[in-house]
């Protein structure tokens, strides 16, 4: 991003999707026994993460896990002092797409 005095931001493609195109998290679903967290976006895409990827979420009770707040930029768990960003989720998706073997 541009930090010059003119306050105009230069967004990278991920920032553009979030701040200009309005991409956001709509809902989060958990299945602790299966170690799955599903993140539903407003463009109808679903992101999947392992709960165990984050130590605080992995050790959370069901009540703590379900006590979260969705903001414009991510998810916050006040009981756990844990924050996961939409930007981080999208970056992980890009890495997964690049590293996955092509299917023909």
Protein language model regions, located:
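Motif-centric detector for short Cys/His coordination patterns
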Residues: 1-104
């Amino acid at each position: 991003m541009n930090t010059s005095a003119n306050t105009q931001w230069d967004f990278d493609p991920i920032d553009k999707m979030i701040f200009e195109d309005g991409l956001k998290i709509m809902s989060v679903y958990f299945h602790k026994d299966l170690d799955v967290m599903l993140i539903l976006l407003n463009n109808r895409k679903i992101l999947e993460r392992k709960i165990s990827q984050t130590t605080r979420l992995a050790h959370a009770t069901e009540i703590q896990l379900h006590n979260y707040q969705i903001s414009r930029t991510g998810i916050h768990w006040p009981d756990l002092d844990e924050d996961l960003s939409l930007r981080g989720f999208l970056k992980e998706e890009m890495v997964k797409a690049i590293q996955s073997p092509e299917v023909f």
